[in-house]
Amino acid sequence: MLDDNSQDISIPEAVVVLCTAPDEATAQDLAAKVLAEKLAACATLLPGATSLYYWEGKLEQEYEVQMILKTTVSHQQALLECLKSHHPYQTPELLVLPVTHGDTDYLSWLNASLR
């Protein structure tokens, strides 16, 4: 049973976008850009991440800043395009996760912030 401040949502169809950046300055710049263009309502930057991955056949290990961006389905494509066009990586991490449940007040704020 849901309490009064949470709901299963179809509107505003919130999504979370994950993106990594090579350093805090780049993450700040990307976040400022998408927030100024109202493509995301909130950007949470988590410095201190270490990513391990194979690139061109070689195991890489890099310090990165994990970005968590909150937006809606109707803004996600423009957000992804903006991040990709301004990102220093050839192939940036761009993952979209659906939000299946959330606080009504927060989701209302998120939706209003993108107008």
Swiss-Prot record:
GO molecular function: copper ion binding
Positions of disulphide bridges: none
Principal subcellular localization: cytoplasm
Statement: the UniProt record of this protein carries the keyword Cytoplasm: yes
Lineage top rank: taxon: Bacteria
Gene Ontology biological process: response to metal ion
Transmembrane spans: none
Keyword Nucleus attached: no
Entry cofactors: Cu cation
Subcellular location as annotated: Cytoplasm
Any Pfam family matching the protein: CutA1
Note on cofactor: Binds 1 copper ion per subunit.
InterPro entries referenced in this protein's UniProt entry, alphabetically: CutA_Enterobact, Ion_tolerance_CutA, N-reg_PII-like_a/b, N-reg_PII/ATP_PRibTrfase_C
Recorded family membership: Belongs to the CutA family.
Function: Involved in resistance toward heavy metals.
Full protein name: Divalent-cation tolerance protein CutA
Organism of origin: Citrobacter koseri (strain ATCC BAA-895 / CDC 4225-83 / SGSC4696)
Gene: cutA
